[in-house]
């Protein structure tokens, strides 16, 4: 019999809206002795059953809900059905975009809290970020081996958030070890090298797929500065769409080297594509002093804000970098700017960019909005799943 969790008065409201998180301060009583990752039943203060979820005694998110169906068992059939339905929801755009790399499970948004699963050609990468996800690791792997026979499964549970769950980092093969962790994926006709062991996140930024396509659409005959370029995949779309020049900037030489490999992989000329190992903030200031200008600038920085306490400082950082970028744009030039922080709401991000335009003494028109690709869905009961915001600004 599972442990029983009773909530404080009034703390059931979010669960009635099917939100999957229960915070520690909502918990009143615990009947039983649940261990890390155990499935528990949750009741309101009057004893009405609400949900069943995974217990995490060290996390502020004390319980992550698996199901709002009292009769549903959290077993192999449960995980198999979740994986099947997630794949079915993605089939249409996988076929449309001719994708061989995509996110299969986006955690809470796909009904599996703390579970991230990405498919890269014949590799599957699991990132298990919660106590419940960690507890059911081998059940999930067993389901994946049946659904995707012949695929090789690798774990990248090396994210700091696991510490908040009382979990150690875990990486390595979950199926038979392979000689290489590299593969090639394809999106919208562009081929990309991915290393699932050493690449960022689970190997690559799948969430920016639609934004890369948009960048290519705008790039024809333009001089493009691609900042925080990582493996230069924005540049691939720009070069493939006849950009006049593309400069990729990143602090990682390994990432830039992979960018050069990606360029060659797609048979694109390196005559008008260059790679600069430099701190973006310093380089932008130097270009401003040198009075360099561009027709299009892409700003895709790492996350500036991890907590609410950092939000004010993050806004200053976003404003500063967007201001300098606007000062480097030719009249009528385009700025593609992004924030990947869930705490940075879309309205606040737009205000920060508008403030940057004022400080730059430029006028900006927001001509298009961008967000995470469709394999990173935003479910109606989990608005926190909306984290990646992008703006296309025409700057005069």
From Swiss-Prot:
It is an enzyme of class 2 (transferase). Coiled coil: none annotated. It comes from the Bacteria. Signal peptide: none annotated. Keywords: Cytoplasm, Methyltransferase, RNA-binding, rRNA processing, S-adenosyl-L-methionine, Transferase. The keyword Methyltransferase applies. It catalyses: cytidine(1962) in 23S rRNA + S-adenosyl-L-methionine = 5-methylcytidine(1962) in 23S rRNA + S-adenosyl-L-homocysteine + H(+). GO terms for cellular component: cytoplasm. SMART domains: PUA. Residues 2-79 form the PUA domain. GO terms for molecular function: RNA binding; rRNA (cytosine) methyltransferase activity. Its EC number is 2.1.1.191. PROSITE patterns: PUA. Gene3D superfamilies: PUA domain, RNA methyltransferase domain (HRMD) like, Vaccinia Virus protein VP39. Specifically methylates the cytosine at position 1962 (m5C1962) of 23S rRNA. Belongs to the methyltransferase superfamily. RlmI family. HAMAP family: 23SrRNA_methyltr_I. This is Ribosomal RNA large subunit methyltransferase I.
């Amino acid at each position: 019999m599972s442990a029983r969790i009773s909530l404080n008065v009034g703390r059931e409201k979010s669960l009635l809206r099917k939100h999957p998180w229960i915070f520690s301060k909502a918990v009143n009583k615990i009947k039983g002795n649940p261990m890390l990752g155990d499935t528990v039943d949750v009741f309101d203060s009057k004893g009405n059953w609400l949900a069943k979820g995974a217990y995490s005694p060290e996390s502020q998110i004390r319980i992550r809900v698996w199901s709002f169906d009292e009769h549903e068992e959290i077993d192999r059939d449960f995980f198999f059905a979740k994986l099947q339905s997630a794949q079915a929801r993605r089939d249409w755009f996988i076929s449309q975009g001719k994708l061989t790399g995509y996110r299969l499970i986006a955690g809470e948004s796909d009904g599996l809290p703390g579970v991230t699963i990405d498919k890269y050609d014949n590799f599957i990468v699991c990132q298990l970020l919660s106590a419940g996800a960690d507890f059911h690791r081998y059940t999930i792997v067993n389901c994946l081996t049946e659904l995707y026979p012949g695929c090789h499964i690798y774990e990248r549970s090396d994210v700091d958030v696991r510490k908040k769950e009382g979990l150690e980092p875990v990486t390595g093969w979950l199926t038979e070890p392979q000689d290489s962790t590299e593969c090639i994926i394809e999106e919208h006709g562009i081929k990309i090298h991915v290393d699932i062991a050493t690449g960022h996140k689970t190997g690559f930024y799948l969430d920016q797929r639609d934004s890369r396509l948009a960048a290519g659409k705008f790039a024809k005959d333009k001089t493009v500065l691609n900042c925080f370029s990582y493996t230069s995949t924005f540049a691939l779309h720009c070069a493939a769409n006849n950009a006049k020049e593309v400069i990729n900037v990143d602090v990682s030489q390994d990432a830039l080297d992979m960018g050069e490999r990606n360029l060659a992989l797609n048979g694109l000329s390196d005559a008008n594509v260059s790679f600069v190992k430099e701190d973006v903030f310093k380089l932008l200031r130097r270009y401003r002093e040198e009075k360099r200008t561009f027709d299009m600038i892409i700003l895709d920085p790492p996350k500036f804000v991890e907590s609410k306490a950092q939000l004010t400082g993050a806004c200053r950082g976003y404003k500063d970098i967007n201001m300098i970028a606007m000062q480097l744009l030719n009249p009528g030039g385009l700025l593609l700017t992004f924030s990947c922080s869930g705490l940075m709401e879309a309205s606040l991000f737009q205000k920060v960019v508008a403030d940057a335009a004022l400080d730059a003494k430029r006028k900006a028109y927001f001509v298009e909005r961008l967000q995470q690709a469709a394999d990173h869905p935003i479910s109606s009961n989990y608005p926190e799943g909306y984290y990646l915001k992008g703006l296309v600004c025409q700057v005069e």
